[in-house]
Swiss-Prot record:
This is Matrix protein 1. Homodimer and homomultimer. Interacts with NEP. Binds ribonucleocapsid by both interacting with genomic RNA and NP protein. May interact with HA and NA. Cannot bind NP without genomic RNA. One of its GO terms (biological process) is viral budding from plasma membrane. It is a peripheral membrane protein. It comes from Influenza A virus (strain A/USSR/90/1977 H1N1). Transmembrane segments: none annotated. Plays critical roles in virus replication, from virus entry and uncoating to assembly and budding of the virus particle. M1 binding to ribonucleocapsids (RNPs) in nucleus seems to inhibit viral transcription. Interaction of viral NEP with M1-RNP is thought to promote nuclear export of the complex, which is targeted to the virion assembly site at the apical plasma membrane in polarized epithelial cells. Interactions with NA and HA may bring M1, a non-raft-associated protein, into lipid rafts. Forms a continuous shell on the inner side of the lipid bilayer in virion, where it binds the RNP. Determines the virion's shape: spherical or filamentous. Clinical isolates of influenza are characterized by the presence of significant proportion of filamentous virions, whereas after multiple passage on eggs or cell culture, virions have only spherical morphology. Filamentous virions are thought to be important to infect neighboring cells, and spherical virions more suited to spread through aerosol between hosts organisms. It holds the Pfam family Flu_M1_C. The gene is M. Residues 1-164 are annotated as: Membrane-binding. Keywords: Host nucleus, Membrane, RNA-binding, Viral matrix protein, Virion.
């Protein structure tokens, strides 16, 4: 796995699923392939994206700044600086300075990542802020190691939270989760169907599913009534794809 592939993997792991994630993935691919060289436009685009947390925007902004060549005097962006200030906690800043001193002596990606993993996410964000604000300089590989360590910590906590929700025994939460998943699956079906003539059937199935979810929410239904809803939808989607000559088995 190449260094940039690894960085892309870690960064995308903290971006919520949805159309925006696909857009960000495309931007990262373009940046890493040297196709997108307008840092100013890229940062303006990132700043106005909805849904993303300030920290995720800060990390993405840091990645773009490290990767896209730019004029030396290019202004640093406030939304990135604010996200990478470690919540203004002086303890985070103290730890960030100690971490920076270690990273300054480290030239490899994996070495930097190993060192960074022993620090809290707040200290890691502050350390990124130091480098972003040109208060310190490390090798690009070390900076990428720092980014990936931060993403790993964030992804770990997201995974713990997700696992708690998935394994909850509360039937109301499970019911709502199934309906949300069915609704997002229906939305994905509508987007994938596009405008081809054969798409009408898939669009119809997706539309009916979304109407059903809306009705279930409006009138209130038994928590078990949503069981299997998402899987039914996915089976419909796979049947449609088969007829279109597309084989995608890894949705479930």
């Amino acid at each position: 796995m190449s260094l940039l592939t690894e960085v892309e993997t870690y960064v995308l792991s903290i971006v919520p699923s949805g159309p925006l994630k696909a857009e960000i993935a495309q931007r990262l691919e373009d940046v890493f392939a040297g196709k997108n060289t307008d840092l100013e436009a890229l940062m303006e685009w990132l700043k106005t994206r909805p849904i993303l947390s300030p920290l995720t925007k800060g990390i993405l902004g840091f990645v773009f700044t490290l990767t896209v060549p730019s004029e030396r005097g290019l202004q640093r962006r406030r939304f990135v600086q604010n996200a990478l200030n470690g919540n203004g906690d002086p303890n985070n800043m103290d730890r960030a300075v100690k971490l920076y001193r270690k990273l300054k002596r480290e030239i490899t990606f994996h070495g930097a990542k190993e060192i960074a993993l022993s620090y809290s996410a707040g200290a890691l964000a502050s350390c990124m802020g130091l480098i972003y604000n040109r208060m310190g300089a490390v090798t690009t590989e070390a900076a990428f190691g720092l980014i990936c360590a931060t993403c790993e910590q964030i992804a770990d906590s997201q995974h713990r939270s997700h696992r708690q929700m998935v394994t909850t025994t509360n039937p109301l939460i499970r019911h709502e989760n199934r309906m949300v998943l069915a609704s997002t699956t229906a939305k994905a079906m509508e987007q994938m169907a596009g405008s081809s003539e054969q798409a009408a059937e898939a669009m119809e199935v997706a539309s009916q599913a979304r109407q059903m979810v809306q009705a279930m929410r409006a009138i209130g239904t038994h928590p078990s009534s949503s069981a299997g809803l998402k899987n039914d939808l996915l089976e419909n989607l796979q049947a449609y794809q088969k007829r279109m000559g597309v084989q995608m088995q890894r949705f479930k």
